[in-house]
Amino acid sequence: MNQHTNLLGALIALATLSTGALAADFQVQGPDGKPLPLVMVTRAPSQPAVTDTSDNGYAPTGKLQQGTFEFTGFTDLGGRVHLPDAPGDYRVRLRKPGFKDHWIEPALLAKATSWRMEAETDLKALAEQRPSNAWTSTLLAGRDDLRKEFMAQCGFCHQQGSSFLRRERSAEDWDSTIKRMVRYGARLSTEAQKELPALLEAHWKDIAAHPEKVPAGTPWSPALSAASVTELPIGDRFSQMHDFIQHSNGMVYVGDNLQDRLYEVNPQTGAYTVYRVPPQPGDNLGGLLAGRLKDFPKHETYQGIHSLAESAKDGHIFITPSYQRRLIEFDPKTKTFSNHEIGSGFYPHTVRIDDKDRVWFTLALSNQIGMYDRTANKFTTYDLPFRSFMEKLTVKLTPFFFKLIGWGVPVTNWVKIDHVSTGVPLPYGIDITPDGKVWIARLHTDEIASLDPATGEITMFATPLKNPRRLRTDRDGNLWIGMFSESAVLRFEPKTAKFTTFHLPVQPVGSDTPYALNVDRKRHQLWVNGTNSDGVHRLDIATGQWTHFPLPRKATFTRDVEFTPDGQVLLSSASFPSWHIEDAQPTLIRLNPNARK
């Protein structure tokens, strides 16, 4: 073997290898022979799993498929990592900031040999290693309000710092792109729409010429050596695996928002079954917003399945279809869908179920909270307050606007939008505290609200930070709220109406966009989506200690968090579009923070 004493790198030695399956212990050494910790070691199949894709590129309804897991571990302080048994041929990728990615092919994995990770010295390549938040931290220096508005309105479908977005474009190209995104639903102010194209053209041209301006991302913690990440590829580049739930039956149910398909996944074996959500008579492609996705190359969105919740009474799953005025109910035992027509309201969004088996959900575009009483088979809607008469009028005209959008009229490009999105207050996340009260976050008004189901009384609370998106309650009845454009979460104590700010543990400071979060009540831990940082963040509530966990794929845009009974963390890569994800493959992600303990 060639010896390059002046090459900063890592020597990877294969210690053991079983026959017919890859069960290996790796040791990572530096050029001085000392152990090298915190190398991300990812094992992936040489070839993707062969599945039946005869239903327009997807598995036929009800037909069992067998996926193949990808496994990632991190080397410990001794430079070691263990890859558990797995049949078949695999490749291994070595990744560490500051080094070139290195792939080890199956033929080399069968030999007791050595590999070297070369140090990366090219400034452009070093910048390209860094996650989206490092790139977006360079945007709009000195224009904090504009930067937050841009990230809030242009960073909720996909990352703005991925390789697809940070490339050089002309102002004309940016103008065209922004107009299309506004048709998709972005509420970027009219002033920002006019100002940003030239600013973005100049900025990304400057960064392309000076990649050294892109700062380093969040340092990797020694805690990673205990962690593992398992990914199961599902769907394709045209899917959007938006939300999911860990069901009491042990399965994970994932909704493909763009293809109206529900995935039933066995997280232990990788076997899964797809159930196509059937459109109802009279449903149009695109639902009530038929013209919204006219430019998208492939979708089967009649309903737009969005958020999921399980009934503790019978295990049925309730799904919000954002492009219709209904709730969908799925019976995991009979594998059948039933529909409940709301009859009013627009854009059913996030859903939760209370202890009385009432289904609560936000109606994002009609400024309402909805409730479905399963026992009485009755819907009730609760109107949230408006900020002005003009906003009330705009919301009341929503049915008319929907018709225009359905006809393909670009009405969203014609109306004037102010900096606070008057007309679209957007009630978004929802949860229920242990005392039975319903809480929502209203994204564009910087407020949360409580609803007392016993009286119907609604109380609004202004948040000290901008853009509350999703919220969850902990075991003490406190609320945790992701503040999307602020790289922070708020804790709200209902008893005292006190807010406390917790900044996310990212570098550069203030650069992440927490789309959602969830509380592991048993372990008293908060887990937050690092939507812009290719990671997930854990806060130990008792100690206040944060830990950042990087994920294996670049452009991993996550929108939800769930937990397995043994404390593993579930996520899904849910970028819209999914072709922004590294290798254009969405996955169901299972993070075990204590795999080696």
Regions found by a protein language model. Give the residues of each.
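Beta-rich, blade/repeat-based domains predominating
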Residues: 237-248, 281-312, 344-356, 388-434, ...
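Blade-level signature of beta-propeller repeat domains, shared across WD40, Kelch, NHL, RCC1
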Residues: 551, 558-597
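A short, solvent-exposed loop/turn motif at the edges and junctions
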Residues: 91-105
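Structural motif
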Residues: 25-37, 56
